[in-house]
Amino acid sequence: MARSLKKGPFVDHHLVKKVEAAAGSKKPIKTWSRRSMILPDMVGVTIAVHNGKNHIPVLVNENMVGHKLGEFAITRTFKGHGGDKKSGK
């Protein structure tokens, strides 16, 4: 279910502070906040989003505005479907 428009977007306060401080920096901002929404202020900033094991660098562009950070750092690794174990035929 989508968030109500009257409530506005949710962004962790500490993440907003870090984005404002690192305006021209190339160093990625490390965050565990996958639930934060991407704002227009974050465009052009590299944010390292935690996926449960390590931080995945995400370069934010204009198409990502309105989505959440967790959408761009997948948590599961897909190994492929069953398939044939005899690959010699």
Curated annotation (Swiss-Prot):
**Which biological process, per GO, is one annotated for this protein?**
ribosomal small subunit assembly
Q: What is an example of a GO molecular function annotated in this UniProt entry?
A: rRNA binding
Annotated GO CC locations? cytoplasm; small ribosomal subunit
Q: Which InterPro entries match?
A: Ribosomal_uS19, Ribosomal_uS19_bac-type, Ribosomal_uS19_CS, Ribosomal_uS19_SF
Q: Which UniProt keywords apply?
A: Ribonucleoprotein, Ribosomal protein, RNA-binding, rRNA-binding
Query: What Gene3D superfamilies does the annotation carry?
Result: 30s Ribosomal Protein S19, Chain A (3.30.860.10)
Question: What's one Pfam family the UniProt record gives for this protein?
Answer: Ribosomal_S19
Determine the domain of life of the protein's source.
Bacteria
Q: Which HAMAP family match?
A: Ribosomal_uS19
Q: Which NCBIfam families match?
A: rpsS_bact (TIGR01050)
Function per UniProt: Protein S19 forms a complex with S13 that binds strongly to the 16S ribosomal RNA.
- Record family assignment: Belongs to the universal ribosomal protein uS19 family.
Name the UniProt record assigns to this protein: Small ribosomal subunit protein uS19
